[in-house]
Amino acid sequence: MRPRKRRMVDFEHPERQFRPFSPESEISEEILLTIDELEAMRLSFLENLSQTEAAARMEIHQSTFQRALKKALEKVTDALVHGKAIRIEGGDYRMPRGDRTGPAGQGPAGGGRGRGQGKGRGGRFGGPEGNCICTACGYETPHTPGVSCSQVKCEKCGSPMVRK
């Protein structure tokens, strides 16, 4: 059996678990979505890249990207339809820098297996143009290409910002 090629991941979501809002019942089942599967969905649907472009960004073949995207969509659909929790962790991935840091200079890269590998958010590609908005006070500033909004602190209150 051929070894799996580690995928290039340029973003890692700060949240690791999503659960249905259901105060009356306990969530008994959980779906595991790998970090590289989440990256496939992000590149395809949020950055609106073609499968060929997204596969190139992840440094994998287009057919491998297509399988990862299909698997991710099946998992998320199953969780939404059947009220299951989604846990994000693991997968075979690496972050862009070769000095064991992620795209924003945070956390280890390299190993790429399991929780805690490849920490870091944002990245060199920067995504489409737009604004960063403060989660606390609502202050907006233009997005700087190549700098993740999550790495920008609000000029007014110092809170982290998110992409609008």
Curated annotation (Swiss-Prot):
UniProt biased composition (Gly residues): 104-115
Pfam family, one: DUF134
Compositionally biased spans, kind Basic and acidic residues: 91-100
Region feature (Disordered): 91-123
Coiled coil: none
Family: Belongs to the UPF0251 family.
Name under which the protein is recorded: UPF0251 protein MM_1448
Organism, scientific name: Methanosarcina mazei (strain ATCC BAA-159 / DSM 3647 / Goe1 / Go1 / JCM 11833 / OCM 88)
